[in-house]
């Protein structure tokens, strides 16, 4: 039994599977006699904040810390290091954020409260998308995985910018000043080539608290901390950034994200009507994810190649790009996160229907994306195809 559990957690798709299980459990509990207890638990106050608040502002800051680490590593030595390798996923990511937002706005332009959710379908759930792709194993070319990873990372970076610019509340000058001071200390530690992680974590904790009190969303502190962690250690030492990234990854993939899904996907269907489910808000989100994502990513990718701005990755064709662009319509955790910010100060009904739209669009995108990849990829593992050609 222990071997089965160990093998499961070694699977690339394990994180995505746990997300689905956590969301399904949350939906089941929320619509059972335990629904009131579930909501009461999430709204229980611990050390001055509700459990839900701790998950969304506290634990998700660790997730954004991991994003910061991944983005920095990719920029310095990975798929985003050179202009040639970064330009293609960067252009695709821009299209993948613009088109869904425009579709949502087209559906909700007449509603001044709903319009604030324009960024909800612009996000991609990197863990979920990579998990679906991992189900196809070695049939997926490495270059296609790198494209999806780079695209999703740039997408996440775009979401961070959107949160900072458009979903910030009333600002506290004093807290902001403390936050800027702690940011300066973090990068001073980096400049002084401090490679021990403890000082970064102490200063980072103060930064998180300052940002929490400033009116800017606290999760952004995680990204700043991630960018401050040094990639290279002192001579003969391991990389502090890679060490932290590898240490955090299992906790984020198998703990924080499933817990976030459990806390946020538990939508009570009581009072939900078919007319509400087919209203402009959920439809704008679902179609933004399901139609806008592939439309934007594929169109911008195709145009970039045809105009000579970028080249297709080796071993990848436009059918693969389209399949991946559909897969990027899985907004799930990131879209739910933005929804919680966008509709924090309006009727709870907005957030309920938004989350249902996210679940509809993300689930459909996951199924269609998987089917497209299944039929467009080689039937044999990439390594087997290569060895047969060389034989």
Swiss-Prot record:
Single Gene Ontology BP annotation: regulation of pH
GO molecular function: sodium:proton antiporter activity
Keyword Cell membrane annotated: yes
Main location: membrane
Assigned keywords, A-Z: Antiport, Cell inner membrane, Cell membrane, Ion transport, Membrane, Sodium, Sodium transport, Transmembrane, Transmembrane helix, Transport
Alphabetical list of Pfam families matching this protein: Na_H_antiport_1 (PF06965)
InterPro entries on file: Na/H_antiporter_dom_sf, NhaA
Chain segments annotated as transmembrane: 14-34, 47-67, 87-107, 117-137, 146-166, 171-191, 205-225, 252-272, 280-300, 318-338, 356-376
GO CC annotation: plasma membrane
Keyword Nucleotide-binding: no
Catalytically driven reaction(s): Na(+)(in) + 2 H(+)(out) = Na(+)(out) + 2 H(+)(in)
Family note: Belongs to the NhaA Na(+)/H(+) (TC 2.A.33) antiporter family.
UniProt-recorded name of the protein: Na(+)/H(+) antiporter NhaA
Recorded name of the encoding gene: nhaA
């Amino acid at each position: 039994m222990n071997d089965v559990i160990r093998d499961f957690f070694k699977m690339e798709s394990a994180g995505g599977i746990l997300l689905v299980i956590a969301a399904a459990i949350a939906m089941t509990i929320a619509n059972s006699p335990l629904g009131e207890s579930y909501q009461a638990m999430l709204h229980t106050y611990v050390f001055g904040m509700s459990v839900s608040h701790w998950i969304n502002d506290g634990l998700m800051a660790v997730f954004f810390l991991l994003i910061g680490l991944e983005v920095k590593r990719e920029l310095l030595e990975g798929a985003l290091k050179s202009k040639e390798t970064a330009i293609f996923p960067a252009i695709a990511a821009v299209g993948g954020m613009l088109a869904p937002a425009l579709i949502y706005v087209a559906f909700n332009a007449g509603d001044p409260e709903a319009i604030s959710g324009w960024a909800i379908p612009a996000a991609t759930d990197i863990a979920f998308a990579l998990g679906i792709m991992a189900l196809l194993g070695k049939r997926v070319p490495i270059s296609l995985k790198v494209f999806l990873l780079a695209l999703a990372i740039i997408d996440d970076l775009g979401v961070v910018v959107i949160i900072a610019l458009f979903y910030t509340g009333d600002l506290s000058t004093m807290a902001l000043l403390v936050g800027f001071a702690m940011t300066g200390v973090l990068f001073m530690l980096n400049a002084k080539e401090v490679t021990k992680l403890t000082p970064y974590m102490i200063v980072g904790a103060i930064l998180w608290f300052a940002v929490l009190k400033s009116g800017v969303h606290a999760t952004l502190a995680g990204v700043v901390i991630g960018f401050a962690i040094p990639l290279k250690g002192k001579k003969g030492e391991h990389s502090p950034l890679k060490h932290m990234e590898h240490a955090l990854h299992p906790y984020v993939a198998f703990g924080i994200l499933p817990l976030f899904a459990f806390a946020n996907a538990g939508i009570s269907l009581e009072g939900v009507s078919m007319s509400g489910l087919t209203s402009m808000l959920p439809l704008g989100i679902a179609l933004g994810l399901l139609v806008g994502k592939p439309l934007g990513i594929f169109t911008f990718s195709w145009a970039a190649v045809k105009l000579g701005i970028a080249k297709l990755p080796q071993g990848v064709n436009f059918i693969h790009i389209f399949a991946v662009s559909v897969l990027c319509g899985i907004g799930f955790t990131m879209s739910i996160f933005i929804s919680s910010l966008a509709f924090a100060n309006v009727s709870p009904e907005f957030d309920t229907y938004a989350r249902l739209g996210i679940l509809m669009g993300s689930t459909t995108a996951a199924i269609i994306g998987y089917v497209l990849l299944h039929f467009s990829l080689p039937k044999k593992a990439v390594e087997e195809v290569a060895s047969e050609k060389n034989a």
